[in-house]
Amino acid sequence: MTPEELALRTDLIEACRSMNSLGINKGTSGNISVRYGDGFMISPTGIPYDKMTPEHVVAMGWDATYSGDVVPSSEWRFHRDILQARLDLNAVVHTHSTHATTLSILGRDIPAIHYLIASAGGSNIRCAPYEIFGSQDLADRVLVALEGRRACLLAHHGVITGHVSIARALSLAVTVEELAHQYLMCLPLGEPSILSDSQVADVLVKFQTYGQQIRSGHVGLRQAS
């Protein structure tokens, strides 16, 4: 096992544990994958996160082959298909967070109630129609719901997020849960006002320069934008 592979396996395990400590997952539900080599690595099925070791993380090829006795998550199909189809995403997080799952039971998309909807890539977070867990039918539904997005809900199931790293995908899962919570709090009071597509588009542009950007060659004072 190379140092790079060990680091990725360790990051994946820490993120699995963080899902539970952050309150967006419980028990052994949920799963995480990360692109690696000519395939991906994914959390195993049925192993408590506090007992998981780097050797438990399963390396899979795009052809669904893997070595060893540890069985990968039953949701490997949508993890594989997302990472194969979306080269802009390097990691996928799946949780059963309470508020996002509640909205998925209602079959509702999350609309643009808050500017942070743009962190998922567009003006809404779609809810994919129900298919049984672990199936290719579910994976196919997920790819459609994720078109132009980095997050979607799964009807009667949970939520999926993807991003350039495990940490970013996990952070987005937290954001989606918060957006779902806010939306559910609004609904008893009536339908909330929704940001327009152009307003969300403005946020998407703003996000391109948000946060700490790497700038080479800058010395001395700069003017804030």
What are these regions (language model features)?
Residues 1-225:
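Glycine-rich flexible loops
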